[in-house]
A protein has these predicted regions:
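Structural helix-adjacent loops and short alpha-helical linkers that scaffold large soluble proteins
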Residues: 92-94, 144, 185-190, 225-233
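Beta/coil-rich, acidic/histidine-enriched accessory regions frequently appended to metallopeptidases
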Residues: 28-30, 34, 245-422
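Sec-dependent N-terminal signal peptides of Gram-negative exported proteins
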Residues: 4-25
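Zinc-dependent metallopeptidase catalytic helix centered on the HExxH motif
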Residues: 127-204, 209
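Zn2+-dependent metallopeptidase catalytic core
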Residues: 28-57, 62-131, 137-154, 158-166, ...
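Extracytoplasmic/secreted proteins, especially bacterial periplasmic and envelope-associated proteins
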Residues: 69, 73-80, 84, 145, ...
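A generic secondary-structure signal for well-formed alpha-helical elements
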Residues: 81-85, 89, 158-166, 178-186, ...
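Active-site-proximal alpha-helical
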Residues: 85, 196-289
């Protein structure tokens, strides 16, 4: 597992991971149980066509009618993903079944093209560890789509082995981050569209697997911004998320979560005294210039007369609202007065991004407010060369507890925004 990270608290050796995990576990303010432990049952059939890799402990089982060419392509894609995961990324391979083999079942109707499922807990492991098997959709086009699908399955199998207690939303997002590193030909991303079309939602949303795969935009951004090498920070999250679940429990241990690890590891990462709240706020601004673009809560012309806008959708913790203000018609010496109000018990961070006609962010201006406040205001000046502004409101969590992805449902908060020429 890689340890070469820019974040000092993640760049540690294995003997120190355990004490680090104990520390981050204490930062979670909830006693939330982890995901349910639900071992899957491999599909059954009378006429499976079996083939095995000659390079890795992988065997596939194809339902009748699967072409030999597709069976061969699946094994080749699995071998390539296995090689890159365990080679360049230095991550552990999936744990197979009791026979020591990782099994693939070529069937129909698999979301994402392929997916690894929990087989069984390892009763001998000191920390939680699990074996897995994978389902592969027989309709997946050969070539890059099949490579990406098998990369998703192999990486998810590695995660089952390393940190099986991670919530499904975070798992899908992190798996997608590494799978796209492995699959260099991957292009087009409908999942990213799903993620960017709902910026007000929490960064992980158990109601939509497409949204959660798209949330790789967040984990990829964190990895690029703070990691020492591609994929290193995501793998560091796995290493620092070991759990101990009692035998016979119905749910995995609830801590530490990936966000517990980030909360400790990214302290002071942006500036001295910065926290994970500041990381959430920075990502909310940066996603405004990502492709595909996020859906704006409002888009308005230059407000020569003050306008008062209400949130069309309340913002969940770790989510954000983006309001676009076009500067067409604004005078050369224009100034914009921004006044934000939001509901009690929500902690929001507001900022303004100046963007040129090419979509490049020229400047980011934080709108200061004290902790637990429900009001913030600023006047934005020096708008020469600016095509439009994004006013961004990020919900960084409630005043009562830190964000826990295992909670599954989070209370969103609304806001009111007053914008007018000053």
């Amino acid at each position: 597992m890689k340890g070469s990270l820019a974040v000092a608290s993640l760049a540690i050796l294995f003997p120190r991971w355990l004490s680090g995990a104990d520390a981050v576990a204490q930062t979670s303010s909830q006693k939330q149980a982890g995901p349910a432990i639900e071992p899957a049952v491999p599909p059954s059939g009378d006429r499976w066509q079996k083939a095995c890799s000659v390079r890795h402990p992988i065997c596939e089982h194809a339902t009748a009618g699967t072409t030999p060419a597709f069976q061969l392509a699946v094994l080749e894609s699995a071998d390539r993903a296995w090689d890159t995961l365990t080679g360049s990324l230095e991550a552990p391979p999936p744990d197979g079944a009791a026979d020591g083999v990782w099994h693939l079942y070529l069937v129909d109707g698999v979301d994402g093209g392929a997916h690894a499922l929990l087989d069984a807990r390892d009763p001998r492991a000191h920390f939680d560890r699990a074996s897995s098997f994978a389902l592969v959709d027989r309709s997946t086009p050969q070539g890059c789509p099949l490579d990406l699908a098998l990369a998703r399955a192999v990486v998810r199998g590695s995660l089952w082995r390393t940190a099986p207690a991670i919530d499904e939303g975070s798992a899908l997002a992190q798996v997608e981050t590494l799978a796209r590193l492995i699959t260099v030909c991957a292009s087009g991303n409908e999942d990213a569209v799903a993620f960017q079309s709902r910026p007000e939602h929490a960064l992980v949303d158990p109601s939509s697997s497409a949204f959660d795969r798209g949330a790789s935009m967040f984990f990829g951004w964190v990895d690029i911004t703070f990691g020492g090498s591609p994929g290193a920070l995501v793998e560091g999250l796995w290493a620092l998320s070991p759990t101990r679940t009692p035998a016979g429990a119905g749910s995995w241990a609830g801590t530490p979560t990936p966000f517990d690890v980030l909360r400790v590891s990214l302290r002071d990462a942006l500036w001295q005294g910065s926290t994970l709240d500041d990381v959430f706020a920075r990502f909310a601004i940066d996603r405004a210039s990502m492709d595909p673009a996020p859906r704006a809560a409002w888009r308005i012309a230059w407000p020569a007369r003050a306008r008062r806008l209400a949130a069309p959708e309340p913002v969940a913790p770790t989510g954000a609202s983006l309001i676009r203000v076009d500067l067409d018609g604004a005078p050369p010496d224009a100034k914009l007065h921004v006044e934000a109000e939001w509901e009690d018990y929500g902690r929001m961070r507001w900022a303004v991004a100046k963007v040129d006609a090419g979509g490049r962010v020229l400047a980011q201006i934080a709108i200061g407010s004290v902790d637990r406040a429900t009001h913030a205001t600023i006047t934005v000046e020096k708008l020469g060369g600016v095509d439009h502004l994004f006013v961004v409101g990020a919900n960084v969590g409630t005043t009562e507890q830190t964000f826990n992805p295992d909670q599954g449902e989070w209370e969103p908060h609304g806001w009111l925004l007053t914008l007018g020429a000053d």
